[in-house]
C-alpha cells in the first residue's frame, strides 16, 4: 500500500527507506512516563534566551576587551547548543536523554565550523589564538625534541618494562575498552590494533615518537594494553547482550531505593545490538565500506599526533586530551550509524553525525598538511602507498578470518541483529499513516504487557533480568 505526502505518492520502498533512516538519525523515545522531561519547552527556552541576552548586554562590565571576546564566544557556543536541542536530530541513541545527543551533534558541527575557519588563517594567527587561550603554550616544547625513542632495545629488564606502565598505558587500556564497546567485534578490534602499530612504523620517518622497541610495541601495546582493553570491552558487550531489557515507569516503582537505581540506570543503554560487521553473503560494497572505516579510523588516530606535533602542545594538555575525549563521544553515534548503513539494505544514506565525523577527520588532516608543510615535505610517498596496501591487506585478511569463523562456528552464535533503542515495529497501519497528509506522526502505542522490540530483548541463554532498573536473578 502506498502512502501520500502532499500530492505525491510514496511507494512501500520509500516508506521503508524513510523509516530506516529515521531510526538511526532521529530516534524516538518509547514509553515516556515523565512527560516533563520529554515535552517541548520552546516558549520557555525562548523566554530564557531573551532574558539572558538582555542581562548579558546591559548588566555586565565590558571594559576589558579580552573578557568581552571570551564571554562572547562562550555565549555563542551556549546558545548554539540551545538551538541544537530545538532543531538537530537525536541520532541513534536516546539514553540518558535525546537532548544530550543533540548537543553532542551541535558540538561536532561547531568543531567542524572551527576547522573551516582555521583553514583561512596563517600559522602565526593560529598560534596567536592558542596563546590567547593558554599563554603557557608559548613555552611548550615538542616531546620529540626532549625525549629519545627506541634506544637500547636489546636491554630488557623488569625495571625498564615496569617504567612503561604509566598514565599513557592506562589510557591505552581504557581507550581500547571503550573502542571495543563501540565496535563490538574481536576481529575488527584486533585488526585495528595491529594495523595501528604498522601505521606507526610507516610514519616513523615523520614523527620520531612513533619509534618503539619491539617488545614495547608487541608485548606491552598490542598484547597487554590493547588486548586487555579489547577483552574487557567485549566481556561487557557479551554481558549486555545476555541481559533482558524491560524498562518501566518511575511511577511503578514504590521504593526510594528502586527509584534511585532506576535513575542511575537511565545512563545505561535501553537495549544492546548484537553486531555482525561481516558475513559470508556480504557484497563487495560491504568489504569496501569496512576498508574505508579502517582508513578513517587510522586517519583520526594520526591526526591526534600530527596536531600536537605541528602546533606544539603536550599530550597532557587539555587541547590534546579534550579533543580525544570529544572525538570518543561523537564516535559512538557515528559507528552506530555507519554500521546501519553498511548492514541494513534499507538504509541508503549515512546519518548526519556520521557525515560530520567524516568531514572532521579529513579537515583535521587538511589542517595538518597546510600548517605542517615543512614536516610533510619529508614524506616518503612509497611509505604511504605501502601503508594503504598494508591496511587493505590486513582488512581483507581480517574479513577472510571473520567469514571462515562465520562458516564454521556461526551456527553457535546469535543471528538476531536489532536496531539499538529502536521503538519501531513493522506496523503497516502506522507506516501508512506516518506519511499520510494530516496524519498523526506518533508511533503506535503498545500495551503495557506487550513485547516491544526496544523495551524487551529476549534470549534463551539469558541468566539475569532487569525490571524497572532493579536486577533480579
From Swiss-Prot:
Q: Cytoplasmic face: residue ranges?
A: 1-35, 94-102, 208-216, 308-319, 377-380
Where is the protein found, in the record's own terms? Endoplasmic reticulum membrane
Lumenal domain ranges by topology: 57-72, 124-186, 238-286, 343-355, 402-473
Q: Would you say which domain of life the source belongs to?
A: Eukaryota
Query: Which parts pass through the membrane?
Result: 36-56, 73-93, 103-123, 187-207, 217-237, 287-307, 320-342, 356-376, 381-401
Output the SUPFAM superfamilies linked to this UniProt entry. Cysteine proteinases
Q: What is its EC number?
A: 2.7.8.29
Q: Which Pfam families match?
A: PSS (PF03034)
Query: Which terms are listed as keywords in the entry?
Result: Endoplasmic reticulum, Lipid biosynthesis, Lipid metabolism, Membrane, Phospholipid biosynthesis, Phospholipid metabolism, Transferase, Transmembrane, Transmembrane helix
**Keyword Lipid metabolism among UniProt keywords:** yes
Q: Name one GO cellular component term.
A: endoplasmic reticulum membrane
Reactions catalysed, as given in the entry? a 1,2-diacyl-sn-glycero-3-phosphoethanolamine + L-serine = a 1,2-diacyl-sn-glycero-3-phospho-L-serine + ethanolamine; a 1,2-diacyl-sn-glycero-3-phosphocholine + L-serine = a 1,2-diacyl-sn-glycero-3-phospho-L-serine + choline
Protein's job: Catalyzes a base-exchange reaction in which the polar head group of phosphatidylethanolamine (PE) or phosphatidylcholine (PC) is replaced by L-serine. Catalyzes mainly the conversion of phosphatidylcholine but also converts, in vitro and to a lesser extent, phosphatidylethanolamine.
The name of this protein is Phosphatidylserine synthase 1
Q: Record the organism.
A: Gallus gallus (Chicken)
Amino acid at each position: 500500500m502506498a502512502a501520500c505526502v502532499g500530492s505525491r505518492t510514496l511507494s512501500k520502498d520509500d516508506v521503508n527507506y524513510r523509516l530506516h533512516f529515521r531510526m538511526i538519525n532521529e530516534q524516538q523515545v518509547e514509553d515516556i512516563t515523565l512527560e516533563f522531561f520529554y515535552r517541548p519547552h520552546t516558549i520557555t527556552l525562548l523566554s530564557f534566551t531573551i532574558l539572558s541576552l538582555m542581562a548579558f548586554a546591559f548588566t555586565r562590565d565590558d571594559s576589558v576587551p579580552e573578557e568581552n571576546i571570551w564571554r562572547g564566544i562562550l555565549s555563542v557556543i551556549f546558545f548554539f547548543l540551545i538551538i541544537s536541542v530545538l532543531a538537530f536530530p537525536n541520532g541513534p541513541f536516546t539514553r540518558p536523554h535525546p537532548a544530550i545527543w543533540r548537543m553532542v551533534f551541535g558540538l561536532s558541527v561547531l568543531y567542524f565550523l572551527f576547522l573551516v575557519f582555521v583553514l583561512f588563517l596563517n600559522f602565526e594567527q593560529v598560534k596567536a589564538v592558542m596563546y590567547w587561550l593558554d599563554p603557557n603554550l608559548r613555552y611548550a616544547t615538542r616531546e620529540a625534541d626532549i625525549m629519545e625513542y627506541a634506544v637500547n632495545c636489546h636491554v630488557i629488564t623488569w625495571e625498564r618494562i615496569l617504567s612503561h606502565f604509566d598514565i599513557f598505558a592506562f589510557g591505552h587500556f581504557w581507550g581500547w575498552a571503550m573502542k571495543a564497546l563501540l565496535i563490538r567485534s574481536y576481529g575488527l578490534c584486533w585488526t585495528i590494533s595491529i594495523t595501528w602499530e604498522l601505521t606507526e612504523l610507516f610514519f616513523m620517518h615523520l614523527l620520531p615518537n612513533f619509534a618503539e622497541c619491539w617488545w614495547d610495541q608487541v608485548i606491552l601495546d598490542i598484547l597487554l594494553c590493547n588486548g586487555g582493553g579489547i577483552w574487557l570491552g567485549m566481556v561487557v558487550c557479551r554481558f549486555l547482550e545476555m541481559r533482558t531489557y524491560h524498562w518501566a515507569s518511575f511511577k511503578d516503582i514504590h521504593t526510594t531505593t528502586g527509584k534511585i537505581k532506576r535513575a542511575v540506570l537511565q545512563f545505561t543503554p535501553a537495549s544492546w545490538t548484537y553486531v555482525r560487521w561481516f558475513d559470508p553473503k556480504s557484497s563487495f560494497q560491504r568489504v569496501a565500506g569496512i576498508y574505508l572505516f579502517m582508513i578513517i579510523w587510522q586517519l583520526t588516530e594520526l591526526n591526534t599526533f600530527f596536531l600536537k606535533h605541528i602546533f606544539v602542545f603536550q599530550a597532557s594538555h587539555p587541547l590534546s586530551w579534550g579533543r580525544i575525549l570529544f572525538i570518543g563521544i561523537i564516535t559512538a553515534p557515528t559507528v552506530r550509524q555507519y554500521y546501519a548503513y553498511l548492514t541494513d539494505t534499507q538504509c541508503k544514506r549515512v546519518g548526519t553525525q556520521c557525515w560530520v565525523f567524516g568531514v572532521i577527520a579529513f579537515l583535521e588532516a587538511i589542517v595538518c598538511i597546510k600548517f605542517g608543510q615543512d614536516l610533510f615535505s619529508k614524506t616518503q610517498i612509497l611509505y604511504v602507498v605501502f601503508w594503504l596496501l598494508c591496511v587493505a591487506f590486513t582488512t581483507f585478511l581480517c574479513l577472510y578470518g571473520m567469514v571462515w569463523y562465520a562458516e564454521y562456528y556461526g551456527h553457535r552464535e546469535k543471528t538476531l541483529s536489532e536496531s539499538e533503542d529502536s521503538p519501531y515495529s513493522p506496523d503497516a497501519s502506522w507506516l501508512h499513516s506516518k506519511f499520510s497528509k494530516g496524519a498523526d506522526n506518533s508511533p503506535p502505542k503498545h500495551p503495557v504487557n506487550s513485547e516491544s522490540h526496544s523495551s524487551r530483548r529476549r534470549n534463551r541463554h539469558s541468566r539475569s533480568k532487569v525490571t524497572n532498573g532493579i536486577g533480579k536473578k
